[in-house]
Structure formats: C-alpha cells, structure tokens
Amino acid sequence: VVGGDECNINEHRFLVALYY
C-alpha cells in the first residue's frame, strides 16, 4: 500500500477493499 498501511489503517482497509 502506497504511503504505509501502518500510518493510516483506515485508508489501508479502504484500499484493500478496492484491490480485492
């Protein structure tokens, strides 16, 4: 995930939803 999932958990989950 670009930007680092550790920094933004919410964005990480959102991106994961888009990727999957």
Swiss-Prot record:
Its EC number is 3.4.21.-. Residues 1-20 form the Peptidase S1 domain. One of its GO terms (molecular function) is serine-type peptidase activity. It is found in: Secreted. Strongly inactivated by diisopropylfluorophosphate (DFP) and to a lesser extent by tosyl-L-lysine chloromethyl ketone (TLCK). Glycosylated. Optimum pH is 8.0. One of its GO terms (cellular component) is extracellular region. Signal peptide: none annotated. Its main location: secreted. Expressed by the venom gland. Keywords: Blood coagulation cascade activating toxin, Glycoprotein, Hemostasis impairing toxin, Hydrolase, Protease, Secreted, Serine protease, Toxin. It is an enzyme of class 3 (hydrolase). Monomer. Belongs to the peptidase S1 family. Snake venom subfamily. Thrombin-like snake venom serine protease. Releases both fibrinopeptides A and B from fibrinogen (FGA and FGB) to form fibrin clots. This is Thrombin-like enzyme okinaxobin-2. It comes from Ovophis okinavensis. The lineage of its organism: Eukaryota, Metazoa, Chordata, Craniata, Vertebrata.
